[in-house]
Amino acid sequence: MGWSCIMLFLAATATGVHFQVQLQQPGAELVKPGASVKLSSKASGYTFTSYWMHWVKQRPGRGLEWIGRIDPNSGGTKYNEKFKSKATLTVDKPSSTAYMQLSSLTSEDSAVYYCAR
């Protein structure tokens, strides 16, 4: 039996029109089914701890699904019930970086993932 891979694309968006605000995510990730992956979003141009960071999923031909959000100041999280056992949100304040770990990956997890301020 051969093996397959799951493709995860990463993108970022920031609210408002302030051109210096940036959320940087690396490119695509290719992982095997059953594995875990940790996605990152590095913020710059604003006070990282002043805004919640949201994570959103979009599968081809489907609408956006809100995964959850994290308060970078306190580390407090809120999840969409659907993703509670799939996603874990964390932050690293010194580097102004938000993370989302996705576990037990399946083909259903192949999507574009956005971080959004």
From Swiss-Prot:
Cellular component aspect of the GO annotation: extracellular region; immunoglobulin complex
Region annotation Complementarity-determining-1: where it falls in the sequence: 50-54
Region annotation (Framework-2) ranges: 55-68
Keyword Transport: no
Swiss-Prot/TrEMBL GO biological process terms: adaptive immune response
Signal peptide: 1-19
Record region (Framework-3): 86-117
Region (Complementarity-determining-2) location: 69-85
SMART domains on file: IGv (SM00406)
Keywords: Adaptive immunity, Immunity, Immunoglobulin, Signal
A Pfam family annotated for this UniProt entry: V-set
Taxonomy, superkingdom: Eukaryota
Region (Framework-1): 20-49
PANTHER family per UniProt: IMMUNOGLOBULIN HEAVY CHAIN
Extra remark: This germline gene belongs to a set of closely related genes that could encode V regions of NPb antibodies.
Protein name in UniProt: Ig heavy chain V region 1-62-3
Source organism per UniProt: Mus musculus (Mouse)
Gene name as annotated: Ighv1-62-3
